[in-house]
Amino acid sequence: HYDCLLKTDEQVGEIIAALKRGGLYENTLIFCFSDHGYKLHRHKQFLYEGGIQMPMMVAGPGIKPKQVRKDLISGIDIAPACLAAAGIKIPKHMEGANFLAKDYQPRKFVVAARDRCDFTIERIRTVVTPRYKYLRNYLTDRPFMQPSYKDNWPVSKKFREMMAKREMNEAQLIFFGSKKAPEELYDLANDPHEIRNLANDPKHRKALAQHRKLLANWIKETGDKGQTTESDAGLLAALKRWGDKCVNPEYDRVRALLKKKN
């Protein structure tokens, strides 16, 4: 971990040195941000904070050093910020906003999505507001720990062993159990690790309704493609790549087509 941090620091230093040699440093914005999710369950490929909250640093002309911002920013906001910095008009079709603009209005919410990753078919949506996170799990007949590329990780084997021996506590079984709730609501201010699901808590009924509406509007406005099953071409490509690992029922359709052709 520390070696990775050191190497990253060295590489950023090399980039800055190259910009200075080329006379570009004083006229360049530098964005440094991470990939999504650490190599852990409930992080990589999922919509909890460990999977979607990215650290990001921006430095360059007009940006005061050592500032810390806590407002919501989406990954789709980076491109508009870059275009604006280069003096290029932001196209109207882009949903992102220039979060470096002087007249920028902080986002009221951010939406994130999870569909098929590798061969594992899933459908989850989340709405994040300054205080809450709302998650909608559409495929409730499938556990979070359905077969995936992570199965050979030592930690995956350990978790499955713990599940088989019933060594997991109630909090751990929220993610590693055989079922998942259709809705999850977390108070990020008081529960940053997203352990206490408040979706059925009467005290948070208003917040639940508000976040449901935000998601429903987003799905309608964007024409969320996750509303329909993936195309035969997409499923066939996954099937050819992953073979017998493709165990979700959606693959039965393309397997039948292949069988019919043969």
Give, region by region, the residue ranges found by the protein language model.
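Active-site His/acidic residue clusters
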Residues: 36-46, 59, 202, 224
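Charged catalytic carboxylate motif
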Residues: 7-11, 77, 210, 250
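Soluble non-cytosolic domains of exported or imported proteins
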Residues: 2-9, 72-73, 189, 202-206
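A long, amphipathic alpha-helix that forms part
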Residues: 1-28, 85
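Generic enzyme active-site microenvironment
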Residues: 33
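C-terminal cap/loop subdomain of S1 sulfatases and analogous C-terminal strand-loop tails that border
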Residues: 38-39, 86-184, 206
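Substrate-binding rim/cap in mid-to-C-terminal beta-strand-loop elements of soluble/periplasmic
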Residues: 13-21, 42-93, 97-108, 125, ...
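Long, internal low-complexity/basic segments
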Residues: 53, 166-183, 188-262
